[in-house]
């Protein structure tokens, strides 16, 4: 009865919006999932070192956020999109407990896809910025991971050949400060982590984006003046920057796109629009396709 009720509600909404292909969707009731006990056993096994009992696992497995991550962990789905009715913390917690971070990554972060009206920047006005969502004050190791993950996100969701700029208020030693030192150290680590990625720093934003300024401030840099991936030194900078671009530049900001998790899990704003949802569905699918290719 409950399953029919859920299906009826979804089908009624689909009819209202003129969606004729809802029959292609698998509609799941967490309370009545045929693999509920199997997933409870899996969760108990994954969390046994934390003292989880099978009774606790059975209670959690009916939570859609936990169930979704368990379905992914078991190989029965490729990604999850949630958050329209949940906090970021509630979305991330089961993802980190069950799916965990990607190999070699300890820092989860969030990228923003910026669709600007300035085709002279990035690739026809398309840029990706990180971190804008998760890690407030990353250290050099974390910042390097953010750079690599943001480059991979740019490849997966925007089809970009990433040209990564590590941003700062200094360009190539023009200013001295411990914050600049962190960016320089992060650049070194990122190059060691992913030698295949084109990356440079530290660069001021104008030096990263404007060819003439890049040539003047960082001669010889292949990234300066041509960056399409912008890595900021802190969450504070990232959050402020993308919102300024969005509001003052009338750019479309798509995201945040969570990165650093072993399989795609994305978090919607509780104020999300229908357009936000379908864009993030497409992005999550692209992340899943890229993850499968990388695993082959």
Where are these regions (language model features)?
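Short, small-residue-biased leader/transition segments that mark boundaries at the very start
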Residues: 1-6
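Anion-binding alpha/beta catalytic cores of soluble intermediary-metabolism enzymes, centered on
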Residues: 8-224, 229-296
